[in-house]
Amino acid sequence: MESQQLSQHSPISHGSACASVTSKEVHTNQDPLDVSASKTEECEKASTKANSQQTTTPASSAVPENPHHASPQPASVPPPQNGPYPQQCMMTQNQANPSGWSFYGHPSMIPYTPYQMSPMYFPPGPQSQFPQYPSSVGTPLSTPSPESGNTFTDSSSADSDMTSTKKYVRPPPMLTSPNDFPNWVKTYIKFLQNSNLGGIIPTVNGKPVRQITDDELTFLYNTFQIFAPSQFLPTWVKDILSVDYTDIMKILSKSIEKMQSDTQEANDIVTLANLQYNGSTPADAFETKVTNIIDRLNNNGIHINNKVACQLIMRGLSGEYKFLRYTRHRHLNMTVAELFLDIHAIYEEQQGSRNSKPNYRRNPSDEKNDSRSYTNTTKPKVIARNPQKTNNSKSKTARAHNVSTSNNSPSTDNDSISKSTTEPIQLNNKHDLHLRPETY
């Protein structure tokens, strides 16, 4: 009777019990799970047969559903409310969150080969700009990333801690050409910043603000793979991925360096076009500045020949250097080195003439001392000249008076005698005497 019951309850579908035994028909000392080996083999064969039938038979309403086996169902995505973009083009809060990717666990467990895109990631058609997102891939990037550690906060608590809530994050466009990669990577970096992942982006020195977590690296790899197909990547990006296909951080770092290089190129071109030199700075410094700019541009693929460089340099010359624009402008084969030889010659001549000129500039204190000493030395000379000038300015009558008085004095000198003979002598001849020359 026991065998009949076992045959009647033999398994007919996957997941059903192999034997059905009631407690009344089993001895008290017998284990209810104890089944003979032959019966066990029959159960296994029946189970294998049921599985083969289930895989080969297409799904229909006639096939009974197994209540003991629940296949994983994708999480339902709420439709966007008042969103400017269609639902298949948006990344909602239940998408793109690294913390929701529990089935990946680690970047090494990513179920995709390097840059082999699954058909589910291709755009639905040429009319759609962005690919459709499956509901099982990604959760929203609007949740803030932790500053440190590898644990992520719950979405409910993360929403309360957000400073600026963005329910929908617009994904970057698809890369369609290697030449568009510099512009595309800018939009991709902006996409990461809007997703609160700006801390993992390399800075100017090439290092991120914080360390990237495994879940964030997984998200970074998958989003880069989705929007940047391998056939449209530049050669230098493919070289990096050939070494490590998950090293997206190195690609971002190199891209930022190239952006800075492009900015430096633009600044160098503007500086070279607006050169000014009048000899106020050393000629060596001016030459070093110009040659460094030309070398950087040539190394970055912007070739500046000697003719263009000389024209730009001579256009900025002024002062005594201005005549170089007219004396050498017809020399088509002139090089930058020859032009700087002329600039150095003029600069050295200027410096030599400045050094040879005497310097008459004095301190104000020295000028005050010199003025005081000059007045002291000239004062006695003025005093010495004044008496002489007054003596010489005496009238002739006064001098004649002195001479007459000196003649009356008993002591006379030769000067007074010679002067007295010139004057007439009047004699009073009271006795009418006539003197004869012979008598005396």
Swiss-Prot record:
Transmembrane segments: none annotated. The keyword RNA-binding applies. Residues 429-440 have a biased composition (Basic and acidic residues). One of its GO terms (molecular function) is RNA binding. It comes from Saccharomyces cerevisiae (strain ATCC 204508 / S288c) (Baker's yeast). This is Transposon Ty1-DR4 Gag polyprotein. Keywords: Cytoplasm, Phosphoprotein, RNA-binding, Transposable element. Coiled coil: none annotated. Residues 299-401 are annotated as: RNA-binding. The gene is TY1A-DR4.
